[in-house]
Amino acid sequence: MAQHDKSPIEPSDRPMGERIVGAAPAGAQGEAAAAEAVRDMFTSIAPRYDLLNHVLSMNIDRVWWNRTARVFSEVLHRPGAQVLDLCCGTGDMTFALHRRLTIPTSAKAALVGGPMNGAPTQIFGADFSHAMLVRAEQKSVGRNIRWVEADALNLPFPSGQFQLVTSAFGFRNLANYDRGLAEIYRVLAPQGEMGILDFGEPKGLIGKLYRVYFRRVLPAIGTLISGVRGPYAYLPASVLRFPSPDEMLQRMRAAGFHEVTWTPYTFGIAGLYRGKK
């Protein structure tokens, strides 16, 4: 597995000084206000969220979701596995995990179909935006996925329930990153695995081109299509505020995770954090 790059982000691009607690939308004072502002933003763009994601990422987001689901294929195929996709939004990562269940991990599994000698895997998608979950449910007809409206910092699940917890482009929006990691750790079963897929900032020429697109072009297109400016001005700011890979790995270790790694995707534009309980 690829290990994290020691310098994936230009130091001058990161906020300096105090330790970052969590997301901080403009004007939000405190964690409760930050969480409410994030919920309001995603509610405002829910109707066109999927279209914008695919257009603005030039469909690379689909590659990232599928690659992440493939990484966790073995866990997904464990008999009776319980899987949680946290901050699931309209469900794209959730659906990628579900699709992976149809791909056997071995010839023997292909013959018997699905998880061997045990109950089927159950996938949950959780988000605190009602509007986003409504969209996810509309897209999930015919799929055995349970949707739960829940706050990632106070999950309604018992400790040790899940063999896998994922989050794609949602963890960055939490009002408190350490509390978010603590909740993931709590709901994971012993030896359970976690994966956080989120944006980074690449280096070199690719990084310079990416920053122009991400900070100038993307907000303009997002605002034009959605008719709402706030979320697409917030997006690049939230990526800048998010901890660097080195710091995220330190936070994961502090939360109790071991075997922590960061694997860059597409020149470091995005990357996958992994850890085990």
Where are these regions (language model features)?
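N-terminal auxiliary segments of SAM/dcSAM-dependent transferases
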Residues: A2-D40
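Hydrophobic beta-strand segment of the Class I
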Residues: Y49, V165-T166
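Conserved alpha-helix/loop element of class I SAM-dependent methyltransferases that forms part
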Residues: M58-A81, A96, R100
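Class I SAM-dependent methyltransferase SAM/SAH-binding core
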Residues: Q82-N154
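A short acidic, Gly/Pro-enriched loop at the edge of an enzyme's catalytic core
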Residues: L153-V165
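A short glycine-rich, Lys/Arg-flanked "PGG" loop and its adjoining helix->strand segment in the class I
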Residues: D178-E193
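Conserved class I S-adenosyl-L-methionine
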Residues: E193-G222
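Core SAM-dependent methyltransferase catalytic element
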Residues: G256-K277
